[in-house]
Regions:
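Secondary-structure boundary elements
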Residues: 106-108, 165
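Compact, charge-rich alpha-helical regulatory domains located at protein termini
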Residues: 38, 126-165
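Residues that scaffold, gate, or flank divalent-cation-dependent active/transport sites
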Residues: 1-80, 85-87, 95-102, 111, ...
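Short, charged/polar, Gly/Pro-enriched secondary-structure boundary elements
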Residues: 86-91, 131-135
Length: 165
């Protein structure tokens, strides 16, 4: 569980799946979160350090250069990897996205990987699609995002809330 100070109180900003299953949510007071977490070694709480996150994401982007020369961090927790023209070096797009996913898993990260002809479609499918690995064929973008929630449009929270009503 990662926390930060907000108006003289500690609140949860991120939590692992284990803490989420226990009922811990972002924005919750740390005292409330602790009451939901059994006193076991898995219950680890520390102060969130966004600077460390940014440095780690940059380092991860550097490691991903083995897949493409065009890699950029997508803060707070993603990478853009432009694979245009690199598929043949990896024996196909399917093998390439599986290699990216496998590399992230070996480094201890969960990864959702999507390939599409546009960045917006790839981002939406990676973040909200039903599968952890996805290839959207050219011309199938509308079909791929049709059933995704409004949040997949990468709009401001206010705009997304308005559209969701």
């Amino acid at each position: 569980v990662l926390t930060r100070a907000v108006n003289a109180r500690e609140v949860v900003v991120h939590r692992c799946d284990w803490a989420a299953r226990a009922g811990v949510r972002a924005g919750m007071d740390l005292a409330h979160a602790r009451s939901l977490l059994p006193t076991q070694p898995e219950a680890h709480v520390e102060t969130h350090r966004p600077d460390r996150d940014a440095a780690a994401l940059h380092a991860l982007a550097c490691r991903a250069l083995r897949f493409s020369p065009l890699v950029a961090p997508d803060a707070p927790d993603g990478l853009w990897i432009d694979i245009t023209g690199t598929e043949r070096l990896h024996k196909g797009e399917d093998r390439l996205i599986r290699a990216v996913s496998g590399a992230m898993t070996r480094l201890g990260f969960g990864a959702r990987v999507a390939s599409a002809s546009t960045y917006g479609c790839a981002w939406a499918v990676a973040h909200y699609g039903p599968h952890g690995l996805a290839i959207v064929a050219p011309g199938r973008e509308r079909e791929a995002i049709a059933d995704l929630p409004v949040g997949a449009l990468r709009l401001s929270p206010e705009t997304a809330d308005g559209l969701g009503e």
